[in-house]
Amino acid sequence: ELHQPKSIWSTFKNAYLRRKNLKKFWRKLDKKNLPEELIKISDLFIKSESYKWTSKFWRHNIINHYKHIINTPASEDTLNAIACSDYAGHSFMDEYSIEKSCENFKDKIELNLNLFKKHPQLSLTKSISHNLILLILYENIKSKNIFKNYDKIEKKLYLKYNPSLEVDDKVITQYMLTSLLEYEKIKILTNSINRPLNILELGAGYGRTANMILSLSKDVKYVIADLPPAVFFSKKNLSNYFPNKKIASAFGITDKNEMMKAFKENDILFVFPHQINLFEKKSFDVSLAI
């Protein structure tokens, strides 16, 4: 597993005190099972300014991610465990959140789902807890106007990396609904803009927020600034699910004019965090770090 339960001190020590020589690890790593594009992205990252910006905590995580990728059989999805542990995860129960979430529909829920559905990546106890949280989230969003967009959502990404339930003849996941609520907030904040949005997302994980926005917004320009291997996976996912979009990487660009040219010519652009400085001021209507 990527993470075994540890004490708070052990977690802190591993993340912040122990030296994590990611450069040395990458140099010595047997890369024969890694995708060629991921190797190229990682080589550029190790030599970039973004590497210097990366915390010990994330260097520790990235080392674990590469170890997991090379040890995962070709028949399995290498991203699944990483997405669940570090790029997303699942929400479980705490008393305050449950009370606040249930205020509007207490005693009104009619169960029409398999609440005891066991998910492969979760224990039965965690599966039931997850299912209850998902049901509560659904009850909070199903009557909102934003939920009318359900049929437009590209759902394959969420179903691939999140446990799902079928409720009212709709297949839902936690991160599908969470991303839809995030999209609702973005629409509220940008309702005065009467043209396609330019969006920058810092740290997109496997691409869940981008997937929602690209599903529901026409002609949006989207830039993702992230570290490998996450940026490789989000690019792969969005390329698969939005084949008609112009998608490019700009990891090797060092010139502002060249970066702005790539920005104007593509719908989705992938960069390292330090390259944000290569975009002109006011290039973006929305900046996200979720």
Region locations from a protein language model:
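Conserved class I S-adenosyl-L-methionine
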Residues: 194-205
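N-terminal accessory regions of S-adenosyl-L-methionine
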Residues: 1-172
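S-adenosyl-L-methionine
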Residues: 237-280
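Hydrophobic beta-strand segment of the Class I
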Residues: 287-288
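Conserved SAM-binding loop of SAM-dependent methyltransferases across substrates and taxa
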Residues: 206-218
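Conserved alpha-helix/loop element of class I SAM-dependent methyltransferases that forms part
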Residues: 176-196
